């Protein structure tokens, strides 16, 4: 293999690199898994375990997507979204949930204009 070939990015990775994704989950393992997957796919990824830090990051930096856990401390995902929607109505949000009863997350999705959800298993 020629030198430098391993450094070539696919067209998809180049396209993905322009997207900034922020994830917040109080489980470090989830952040680590998302980091590995999204960075390998070429995305510009930032992960945090503190919901308050996530709110501050969205205030001070541009992100194209927020992936967040539904149940966290000190704030639940719905509280994080309520705060973010006060100053950023355009951010695409994906809610992660390990909730067995999907009624609370689905009600939150409708109420807070969250674009999607994904179940943790």
Language-model features and meaning:
Residues 1-20:
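Non-catalytic signal-transmission and effector/linker regions of two-component phosphorelay proteins
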Residues 19, 49-53, 75-80:
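Acidic catalytic/metal-coordinating carboxylates
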Residues 28-46:
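Two-component/phosphorelay signaling modules centered on CheY-like receiver
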Residues 47-65:
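Acidic, metal-coordinating helix/loop segments flanking the phosphotransfer/catalytic sites
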Residues 59-61, 84-90, 111-112:
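Conserved phosphotransfer cores of two-component systems
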Residues 79, 86, 100-118:
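Alpha4 helix (beta4-alpha4-beta5 surface) of REC/receiver domains from two-component response regulators
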């Amino acid at each position: 293999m020629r030198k430098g070939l391993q450094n070539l990015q696919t067209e998809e990775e180049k396209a993905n690199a322009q997207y900034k994704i922020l994830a917040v989950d109080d489980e470090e393992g989830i952040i680590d898994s998302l980091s590995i997957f999204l960075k390998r796919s070429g995305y510009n990824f930032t992960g945090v375990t503190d919901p308050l830090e996530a709110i501050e990051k969205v205030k001070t930096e541009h992100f194209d997507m927020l992936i967040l856990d539904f149940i966290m401390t000190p704030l639940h995902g719905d509280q994080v979204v309520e705060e973010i929607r006060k100053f950023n109505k355009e951010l695409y949000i994906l809610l992660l949930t390990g909730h067995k009863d999907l009624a609370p997350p689905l009600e939150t999705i409708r109420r807070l204009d969250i674009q999607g959800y994904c179940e943790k298993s």
